[in-house]
Amino acid sequence: MAAVAVAVREESRSEMKTELSPRPGAAGRELTQEEKLQLRKEKKQQKKKRKEEKGADQEIGSAVSAAQRQDPVRELQGTGSQLGGTTGEKLPAGRSKAELRAERRAKQEAERALKQARKGEQGGPSPQACPSTAGEATSGVKRVPEHTQADDPTLLRRLLRKPDRQQVPTRKDYGSKVSLFSHLPQYSRQSSLTQYMSIPSSVIHPAMVRLGLQYSQGLVSGSNARCIALLHALQQVIQDYTTPPNEELSRDLVNKLKPYISFLTQCRPMSASMCNAIKFFNKEVTGMSSSKREEEAKSELKEAIDRYVQEKIVLASQAISRFASKKISDGDVILVYGCSSLVSRILQEAWVEGRRFRVVVVDSRPRLEGRHMLHCLVRAGVPTSYLLIPAASYVLPEVSKVLLGAHALLANGSVMSRVGTAQLALVARAHNVPVLVCCETYKFCERVQTDAFVSNELDDPDDLQCKRGDQVTLANWQNNSSLRLLNLVYDVTPPELVDLVITELGMIPCSSVPVVLRVKSSDQ
């Protein structure tokens, strides 16, 4: 078939040559306009004819190759005879080239399978050797690893080496932990970080040491209060800072802050508001020009901290209070949980503006923060009721709305707040009561979390002991090997249980958190 295609091409070329040859009688005189047009038409037809012949040749070549693929034995025999004629090679009697090639391929597959089996014996099963069905799986193979990323021993050892390099004391675990939360550090007020710390020779600034102790003892609590206290401590660090010789303030100050942050984390895990404030401060420090004098740079940093507190916390809470007061009407029964400084301000300002409503304060052990909220509202003259969280379902039928604070708002719209918030939101949804969450945008974080197991905080388990007179319930619980106490600090409320989030930017749904984060990152 290839020879036929070559013959057809040669014949067509000879015909085109005869067509392109000059006509007899045309030489020696100038062509008229009609003859020129006729010649152009003939050239176009010849060009079209060449294209058609070229396409036919390609179809013939593809047909030949397809026929060869369909009958590879004949092709191999032909090539084998050609090779044998040229090189003198002789095939074994009664065996074709295709059969020899198939035999070689089978040997290669057997060798490859043997190598994979040897690798599986040395370093575990290879991906190809793993069974694809449940029937092929053996009982010795574990589908789930023994350790996840959070409780991996190598990762935990690496995290412990970091404070040692920074000369920061580490807190030891206290008591036995629940297995689901074994990857989280267990804090206790009985073990002090500063017990064996020498303040004069320590790398930690005294203001940071005092702040860490206040965090660990619970003297400073609440996201806003902890963030403001941290920023004020940073101002004291800046005031006492002196740039070493042959160093730049923008680099040395950031490195000096790292052990301070590690010490505060050992005292109590950082909140989302504190992490965002530290990111802001580091950005201000690294963006400081090296040509500025030290006193001028320190003054600008302290002014930036004051501006951050004023804009992100003070003015933001004022704007949220104005937006939230529009949702409070006369005769409302508002349920609040725990003690949120922002929610307390909203209720007191709405009462001062003339709106008349009633508040139900729900509280929970062991912190009993709702007592402080109760004291503030009663002092402002707001009619208030007080109860514990197990009785919340009995008062929800008469509640008109639930007003909650937030520890952080995650990127997937989940609300991280005091443990028990998710329970209240779930019961409120069952009674068709709207849930409103008040939160500043500086508490928005890019972390995604769907449960309270992976990332959380474990408080002192001794706080769960109940003292009644001289008797202490759960005394010496550490000696009981079958007893473990769990004192969780936060839980995660899914966005489906939250109707509205009130921020200084306005009232938004939980699904708008990624939009706010993207706008904030573009503005910065």
Curated annotation (Swiss-Prot):
Residues 1-174 are annotated as: Disordered. One of its GO terms (biological process) is hippocampus development. It comes from Rattus norvegicus. The keyword Cytoplasm applies. GO terms for molecular function: guanyl-nucleotide exchange factor activity; translation initiation factor activity; translation initiation factor binding. The modification Phosphoserine is found at S12. InterPro entries: IF-2B-related, IF_2B-like_C, NagB/RpiA_transferase-like. Its main location: cytoplasm. This is Translation initiation factor eIF2B subunit delta. Residues 171-180 are annotated as: May bind the chemical integrated stress response (ISR) inhibitor ISRIB. Keywords: Acetylation, Cytoplasm, Initiation factor, Phosphoprotein, Protein biosynthesis.
